[in-house]
Amino acid sequence: MATTVPDPDAGLEPTFAAPPQACDAHFHVFGPAGRYPYGSDLRYAPPQAPLSEYLKLAGRLGFVRFVFVQPSAYGFDNSCMFDAMDELDPAVRRAIVDLDETKATDAQLADWHARGVRGIRVNISPVRQPEAGLSQSMLPRIARLAAICRELGWHLDFLTPGWLVSELMPMLRELPIGFTVAHFGLYPAKDGVKQPGFQGFLKLVNDGSQRCYVKLTGIYRFSLAPGFADVTPFARALIQTVPDQLIWGSDYPHLSFHDKVGTIGLYNKLGEWAPDPAARQRILVDNPARLFGFA
Protein backbone atom coordinates (compact mmCIF):
# COMPACT_ATOMS: atom_id res chain seq x y z
CA MET A 1 0.00 0.00 0.00
CA ALA A 2 1.27 3.47 -0.85
CA THR A 3 2.32 5.62 2.06
CA THR A 4 2.09 9.35 2.60
CA VAL A 5 5.35 11.18 2.04
CA PRO A 6 6.66 12.76 5.27
CA ASP A 7 8.45 16.11 5.19
CA PRO A 8 12.13 15.84 6.15
CA ASP A 9 12.42 19.49 5.09
CA ALA A 10 10.23 20.73 7.93
CA GLY A 11 11.90 23.80 9.41
CA LEU A 12 14.40 24.19 6.57
CA GLU A 13 14.54 27.13 4.18
CA PRO A 14 16.55 27.56 0.97
CA THR A 15 19.95 29.13 1.59
CA PHE A 16 20.04 30.83 -1.81
CA ALA A 17 17.46 32.18 -4.23
CA ALA A 18 16.91 30.23 -7.42
CA PRO A 19 17.62 32.28 -10.54
CA PRO A 20 14.70 33.14 -12.83
CA GLN A 21 13.60 30.23 -15.06
CA ALA A 22 15.21 27.65 -12.76
CA CYS A 23 14.58 24.04 -13.77
CA ASP A 24 14.22 20.89 -11.69
CA ALA A 25 15.64 18.48 -14.26
CA HIS A 26 14.86 15.16 -12.56
CA PHE A 27 11.83 14.30 -10.45
CA HIS A 28 9.02 11.74 -10.34
CA VAL A 29 5.31 11.69 -9.62
CA PHE A 30 3.24 8.80 -8.28
CA GLY A 31 -0.53 8.46 -8.24
CA PRO A 32 -3.03 6.13 -6.55
CA ALA A 33 -2.10 2.48 -7.13
CA GLY A 34 -5.68 1.67 -8.08
CA ARG A 35 -5.52 4.09 -11.00
CA TYR A 36 -1.89 3.64 -11.96
CA PRO A 37 -0.86 0.00 -11.37
CA TYR A 38 2.80 -0.74 -10.78
CA GLY A 39 4.90 -2.82 -13.14
CA SER A 40 6.69 -6.08 -12.43
CA ASP A 41 10.07 -4.50 -11.61
CA LEU A 42 9.07 -3.04 -8.24
CA ARG A 43 12.27 -2.12 -6.39
CA TYR A 44 10.68 -0.06 -3.60
CA ALA A 45 7.35 0.70 -1.94
CA PRO A 46 6.23 3.73 -3.97
CA PRO A 47 5.06 6.69 -1.90
CA GLN A 48 2.00 8.58 -3.02
CA ALA A 49 3.52 11.72 -4.48
CA PRO A 50 1.07 13.65 -6.65
CA LEU A 51 2.07 16.66 -8.71
CA SER A 52 0.19 18.97 -6.34
CA GLU A 53 2.50 18.07 -3.46
CA TYR A 54 5.59 18.41 -5.60
CA LEU A 55 4.54 21.84 -6.85
CA LYS A 56 4.22 23.14 -3.29
CA LEU A 57 7.85 22.20 -2.75
CA ALA A 58 8.95 23.55 -6.13
CA GLY A 59 7.27 26.83 -5.28
CA ARG A 60 9.26 27.12 -2.07
CA LEU A 61 12.46 26.67 -4.06
CA GLY A 62 11.55 28.86 -7.01
CA PHE A 63 11.45 26.25 -9.78
CA VAL A 64 9.28 27.13 -12.77
CA ARG A 65 10.53 24.60 -15.34
CA PHE A 66 10.13 20.88 -14.87
CA VAL A 67 11.53 17.65 -16.31
CA PHE A 68 9.48 14.61 -15.36
CA VAL A 69 11.33 11.29 -15.32
CA GLN A 70 9.50 7.98 -15.63
CA PRO A 71 10.11 5.90 -12.47
CA SER A 72 10.92 2.20 -12.72
CA ALA A 73 7.80 1.32 -10.70
CA TYR A 74 5.55 1.99 -13.70
CA GLY A 75 7.64 0.14 -16.27
CA PHE A 76 6.67 1.18 -19.79
CA ASP A 77 3.35 2.70 -18.68
CA ASN A 78 3.98 6.45 -18.72
CA SER A 79 0.34 7.41 -18.12
CA CYS A 80 0.75 8.72 -14.55
CA MET A 81 3.51 11.04 -15.71
CA PHE A 82 1.61 12.18 -18.80
CA ASP A 83 -1.54 12.89 -16.79
CA ALA A 84 0.51 15.05 -14.41
CA MET A 85 2.18 16.84 -17.32
CA ASP A 86 -1.23 17.75 -18.70
CA GLU A 87 -1.77 19.92 -15.60
CA LEU A 88 1.11 22.21 -16.58
CA ASP A 89 1.72 24.70 -19.37
CA PRO A 90 3.49 22.80 -22.19
CA ALA A 91 6.09 25.58 -22.33
CA VAL A 92 7.44 24.69 -18.89
CA ARG A 93 7.39 20.89 -18.96
CA ARG A 94 9.55 18.18 -20.51
CA ALA A 95 9.80 14.44 -19.90
CA ILE A 96 11.99 11.36 -20.06
CA VAL A 97 10.01 8.20 -20.85
CA ASP A 98 10.63 4.49 -20.71
CA LEU A 99 9.30 2.46 -23.61
CA ASP A 100 9.28 -0.84 -25.43
CA GLU A 101 11.08 0.19 -28.58
CA THR A 102 9.83 -2.90 -30.41
CA LYS A 103 6.23 -1.72 -30.08
CA ALA A 104 6.47 2.07 -30.27
CA THR A 105 4.92 3.49 -33.44
CA ASP A 106 5.99 6.58 -35.34
CA ALA A 107 2.64 8.20 -34.55
CA GLN A 108 3.02 7.50 -30.83
CA LEU A 109 6.54 8.89 -30.77
CA ALA A 110 5.45 12.01 -32.65
CA ASP A 111 2.63 12.53 -30.16
CA TRP A 112 5.01 12.12 -27.25
CA HIS A 113 7.42 14.62 -28.77
CA ALA A 114 4.58 17.13 -29.09
CA ARG A 115 3.76 16.53 -25.41
CA GLY A 116 7.30 17.42 -24.38
CA VAL A 117 9.20 14.13 -24.33
CA ARG A 118 12.89 14.69 -25.03
CA GLY A 119 14.57 11.47 -23.93
CA ILE A 120 14.37 7.75 -23.16
CA ARG A 121 15.54 6.22 -19.93
CA VAL A 122 17.97 3.30 -19.65
CA ASN A 123 17.41 2.24 -16.06
CA ILE A 124 19.33 -0.45 -14.17
CA SER A 125 18.97 -0.66 -10.39
CA PRO A 126 21.61 1.45 -8.62
CA VAL A 127 22.25 -1.39 -6.17
CA ARG A 128 22.74 -4.09 -8.80
CA GLN A 129 25.98 -5.95 -8.24
CA PRO A 130 28.56 -6.57 -10.98
CA GLU A 131 27.25 -9.14 -13.41
CA ALA A 132 29.27 -10.71 -16.19
CA GLY A 133 27.80 -10.07 -19.61
CA LEU A 134 25.19 -7.52 -18.55
CA SER A 135 26.73 -4.57 -20.36
CA GLN A 136 27.10 -6.55 -23.59
CA SER A 137 23.50 -7.75 -23.37
CA MET A 138 22.31 -4.12 -23.16
CA LEU A 139 24.02 -2.94 -26.34
CA PRO A 140 21.43 -4.04 -28.93
CA ARG A 141 18.60 -2.28 -27.11
CA ILE A 142 20.69 0.85 -26.57
CA ALA A 143 21.41 0.92 -30.31
CA ARG A 144 17.70 0.67 -31.11
CA LEU A 145 16.85 3.42 -28.61
CA ALA A 146 19.65 5.61 -29.94
CA ALA A 147 18.21 5.30 -33.45
CA ILE A 148 14.84 6.53 -32.19
CA CYS A 149 16.48 9.41 -30.33
CA ARG A 150 18.55 10.41 -33.32
CA GLU A 151 15.44 10.60 -35.49
CA LEU A 152 13.54 12.76 -32.99
CA GLY A 153 16.35 14.88 -31.58
CA TRP A 154 16.03 13.19 -28.19
CA HIS A 155 18.75 11.93 -25.86
CA LEU A 156 19.29 8.80 -23.77
CA ASP A 157 19.14 9.09 -19.98
CA PHE A 158 21.29 6.51 -18.19
CA LEU A 159 20.75 5.44 -14.59
CA THR A 160 23.11 2.57 -13.83
CA PRO A 161 25.58 1.72 -11.07
CA GLY A 162 29.07 3.10 -11.52
CA TRP A 163 30.64 -0.24 -12.39
CA LEU A 164 28.18 -0.53 -15.27
CA VAL A 165 28.82 3.03 -16.48
CA SER A 166 32.48 2.07 -16.71
CA GLU A 167 31.71 -1.16 -18.59
CA LEU A 168 29.53 0.79 -21.03
CA MET A 169 32.24 3.41 -21.57
CA PRO A 170 33.43 2.10 -24.98
CA MET A 171 29.87 2.34 -26.28
CA LEU A 172 29.30 5.76 -24.71
CA ARG A 173 32.44 7.13 -26.37
CA GLU A 174 30.97 6.24 -29.76
CA LEU A 175 27.29 6.98 -29.09
CA PRO A 176 26.12 9.19 -31.98
CA ILE A 177 23.62 11.17 -29.89
CA GLY A 178 23.57 13.20 -26.70
CA PHE A 179 23.01 11.48 -23.36
CA THR A 180 22.67 12.18 -19.68
CA VAL A 181 24.05 10.21 -16.74
CA ALA A 182 22.11 10.41 -13.49
CA HIS A 183 23.39 10.58 -9.93
CA PHE A 184 26.99 11.61 -10.76
CA GLY A 185 27.48 8.21 -12.44
CA LEU A 186 26.85 6.44 -9.10
CA TYR A 187 30.51 5.94 -8.27
CA PRO A 188 30.90 5.15 -4.53
CA ALA A 189 31.79 8.41 -2.82
CA LYS A 190 33.79 6.58 -0.18
CA ASP A 191 36.35 5.64 -2.85
CA GLY A 192 37.08 9.30 -3.64
CA VAL A 193 37.42 11.26 -6.86
CA LYS A 194 40.71 9.57 -7.75
CA GLN A 195 39.07 6.16 -8.20
CA PRO A 196 39.71 4.93 -11.75
CA GLY A 197 36.03 4.67 -12.61
CA PHE A 198 35.24 8.29 -11.84
CA GLN A 199 38.42 9.51 -13.50
CA GLY A 200 37.42 7.64 -16.65
CA PHE A 201 33.97 9.16 -16.39
CA LEU A 202 35.42 12.68 -16.12
CA LYS A 203 37.48 12.00 -19.23
CA LEU A 204 34.37 10.87 -21.12
CA VAL A 205 32.34 13.90 -20.08
CA ASN A 206 35.20 16.23 -20.98
CA ASP A 207 35.95 14.73 -24.40
CA GLY A 208 35.07 17.99 -26.16
CA SER A 209 31.91 16.72 -27.85
CA GLN A 210 29.58 18.03 -25.12
CA ARG A 211 27.35 14.99 -25.78
CA CYS A 212 27.23 13.98 -22.11
CA TYR A 213 25.40 15.94 -19.43
CA VAL A 214 25.71 14.87 -15.79
CA LYS A 215 22.81 15.06 -13.37
CA LEU A 216 23.79 16.36 -9.93
CA THR A 217 21.14 14.17 -8.35
CA GLY A 218 20.55 11.31 -5.93
CA ILE A 219 23.60 11.83 -3.74
CA TYR A 220 22.09 9.68 -0.96
CA ARG A 221 22.39 6.69 -3.29
CA PHE A 222 26.20 6.67 -3.36
CA SER A 223 27.25 8.62 -0.24
CA LEU A 224 27.64 7.23 3.25
CA ALA A 225 29.10 10.28 5.00
CA PRO A 226 27.17 12.51 7.41
CA GLY A 227 25.74 15.44 5.51
CA PHE A 228 26.94 13.84 2.26
CA ALA A 229 30.29 15.55 2.81
CA ASP A 230 32.10 12.98 0.66
CA VAL A 231 30.12 14.10 -2.42
CA THR A 232 31.55 17.64 -2.38
CA PRO A 233 34.84 16.72 -4.13
CA PHE A 234 32.88 14.97 -6.90
CA ALA A 235 30.60 17.95 -7.40
CA ARG A 236 33.45 20.43 -7.46
CA ALA A 237 35.47 18.30 -9.88
CA LEU A 238 32.54 18.29 -12.30
CA ILE A 239 31.80 22.00 -11.84
CA GLN A 240 35.43 22.88 -12.50
CA THR A 241 35.72 20.56 -15.50
CA VAL A 242 32.40 20.75 -17.39
CA PRO A 243 30.29 23.61 -16.00
CA ASP A 244 28.20 23.75 -19.19
CA GLN A 245 27.24 20.06 -19.03
CA LEU A 246 25.67 19.85 -15.58
CA ILE A 247 22.02 19.93 -14.54
CA TRP A 248 20.42 19.63 -11.12
CA GLY A 249 17.36 17.64 -10.12
CA SER A 250 15.60 17.05 -6.84
CA ASP A 251 14.95 13.33 -7.47
CA TYR A 252 11.70 13.95 -5.58
CA PRO A 253 10.14 12.04 -3.81
CA HIS A 254 13.39 10.18 -3.05
CA LEU A 255 11.65 6.79 -3.10
CA SER A 256 13.19 4.38 -0.56
CA PHE A 257 14.89 7.38 1.09
CA HIS A 258 11.76 9.54 1.24
CA ASP A 259 11.51 9.46 5.03
CA LYS A 260 15.19 10.40 5.51
CA VAL A 261 16.05 12.95 2.80
CA GLY A 262 14.48 16.30 1.98
CA THR A 263 14.58 18.27 -1.24
CA ILE A 264 15.38 21.62 0.37
CA GLY A 265 18.36 20.10 2.16
CA LEU A 266 19.58 18.67 -1.15
CA TYR A 267 19.03 22.00 -2.90
CA ASN A 268 21.11 23.73 -0.24
CA LYS A 269 23.98 21.34 -1.00
CA LEU A 270 24.17 22.89 -4.48
CA GLY A 271 24.83 26.23 -2.82
CA GLU A 272 27.80 24.68 -1.02
CA TRP A 273 29.20 23.08 -4.18
CA ALA A 274 28.64 26.16 -6.34
CA PRO A 275 28.81 29.32 -4.22
CA ASP A 276 29.19 31.41 -7.39
CA PRO A 277 25.73 32.51 -8.65
CA ALA A 278 27.03 32.37 -12.24
CA ALA A 279 27.74 28.65 -11.85
CA ARG A 280 24.27 28.05 -10.44
CA GLN A 281 22.79 30.02 -13.35
CA ARG A 282 24.38 27.53 -15.73
CA ILE A 283 23.32 24.46 -13.76
CA LEU A 284 19.75 25.53 -13.00
CA VAL A 285 18.85 27.60 -16.08
CA ASP A 286 21.19 27.73 -19.06
CA ASN A 287 22.20 24.07 -19.31
CA PRO A 288 18.72 22.53 -18.91
CA ALA A 289 17.27 25.12 -21.30
CA ARG A 290 19.79 24.04 -23.94
CA LEU A 291 19.37 20.31 -23.32
CA PHE A 292 15.58 20.20 -23.13
CA GLY A 293 14.74 23.04 -25.50
CA PHE A 294 13.12 25.49 -23.13
CA ALA A 295 12.60 28.83 -24.85
Positions of predicted regions on the chain:
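Mid-to-C-terminal alpha-helical segments outside catalytic/metal-binding sites
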Residues: 2-21, 47-65, 243-247, 258-295
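Acidic/histidine-rich helix-loop elements
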Residues: 32-47, 129
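Active-site gating/metal-coordination segments in enzymes
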Residues: 2-6, 10, 75-163, 215-220
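Conserved, mostly hydrophobic/aromatic
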Residues: 26, 58, 81, 112, ...
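Acidic-and-aromatic substrate-binding clefts and catalytic sites of carbohydrate-active enzymes
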Residues: 70-76, 98-106, 128-132, 160-166, ...
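Catalytic pocket-lining loop regions of alpha/beta-barrel enzymes
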Residues: 134-248
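Hydrophobic faces of well-ordered beta-strands that scaffold small-molecule active sites
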Residues: 22-27, 66-69, 93-97, 120-122, ...
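Alpha-helical scaffold segments that flank or form the walls of functional sites
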Residues: 40-88, 110-111
